Amino acid sequence: MKTQILLFCLIALSLVVPAQKTVKSESKGSVLIAGGTLIDGSGARRREVDIRIAGDRIRQIGKLKPLAGELVIDAKGMIVAPGFIDIHNHSERGFANDPNAKSQVLQGITTLAIGPDGGSPFPIADYFDWLEKQHPAVNVVAFVGHATVRQRVMGKDFNRRATESEIARMAELVEQAMREGAVGLSTGLEYDVGNPATTEEVIALARVTAKFGGIYMSHVRDEADLAFDAFREAIRIGREAGLPVQISHIKLGTVGVWNKAGEVVRLIESARRGGLDITADCYPYDAWASTITVLVPSRRHDDRAAVKKGLDDVGGGQNVLITNCSSHRDYEGKTLEQIAKAAAETAVDVYMQIVRDGGASVVCQSMTSADIKTFYQQPWVMVASDGGIGMRHPRGAGTFPRVLGLYVRERKWLTLEEAIRKMSSFPARRLGLKDRGLIKAGMKADLVIFDPEKVIDRSTMTQPGLEPDGIKYVLVNGKTVVAEGKVADASGEILRQGNRN
């Protein structure tokens, strides 16, 4: 998705989705979730128990009787799981219009990490202060973006190698963000601001992150023909900087590398055997969303041969859907091929025109189900959306229900217990959230209650905001934020991470 590279304007933000009405949450006192089937997030087998919540914590698990005046949630026939934790989310600006984060909580997300792909709010402290005043419905963790600090230092002159003094200044900004509570450093090395950076520049900033116990999360430099070189670069950065690595939305996005997920797995597992703490996340769709310029990795957007190769690599202009184009609003919702036919031109002509006129956001259907399956079946790959509030891609509203409904119930790629681990305790541990991600006494009461026979996504490429089915209740910090599909009062927290060493 398009990297946010400028200081976020927190007052005069354009609307993304309409504000949502709320319903009042339950009165003070304990809550009993009765009769449900518990999947605790650890990967352990399910069991039928009751759960008592008092305040923002889980207090008891077992066969429990209601207390006088206690609110009881009937979970019979339902799965009770830890709230889903989205390690890769682009809701930074969406909270301005929809602090209830309806599209997020309705799919069971209780904690999300913003600032991926190299773009983040800055300063982090100012953003956190602003966000607290919005009273978000979900808990929020933040990464500091490499492209954000790079452009703050280099301005518009970013299309070159940074000098030593510029890298030193970037390092100061990364340290500032880590002290203000960032969980790690993110990069978007495929994007315009991050792409000119050398590996050595990123290593220098990652070393600063490592001093604070942070992690390195990367949208790697290439997800097409040079994907394997890009994965090796991420491994090198982790080794030389001495910190954990998270590969964002692991994928093989062009025809030339389709069905090579097994080779990627062998590369990553070799690094893991060598002692590197490297993991990845994956979203459950065969279409990616980004800026149109990534279709031509060489950045030779005025070279017809280079543009044609870029389009051929994703199966042609019919696979490239325009989702946001400020210079040509009439192009939105159409493919390059459709636009070209209407104008009696070629898809190459349309691409070059759009780039000349300022670019666009696109959804490109160019991944294989076989590769997605291979990635999801690795124990070191978690579920993440790469979505966010108002996202013009179905993953923004449907990621977690899609995994549960399509990949667990229908295709049986994963057990329900393993899928929930990939959505809860696994990302929690990656983010250093010690009291979230598991259902056990003393943990924060972030929970989701869903119908395992009905849960499924409904969002599509043409209707990306459709709400999923089957998510009945969502609790954040002990308060009900979703009850039978209605969004209730917000109760999220800002999870400042600080120094984790």
Segments from the language model and where they lie:
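Sec-dependent signal peptide recognition
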Residues: 2-8
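Hydrophobic h-region of N-terminal signal peptides that target proteins for export
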Residues: 10-18
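Active-site microenvironment of metallo-dependent hydrolases
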Residues: 19-49, 53-54, 63-64, 105, ...
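Divalent-metal coordination cores built from histidine and acidic residues
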Residues: 75-80, 84-89, 96-187, 206, ...
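Short, ordered loop/turn segments at secondary-structure junctions
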Residues: 117-118, 190, 220-222, 250, ...
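Active-site-adjacent beta->alpha loops and helix N-cap segments on the catalytic face
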Residues: 123, 195-202
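Active-site neighborhoods of metal-dependent hydrolases
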Residues: 143-144, 148, 152-164, 168-192, ...
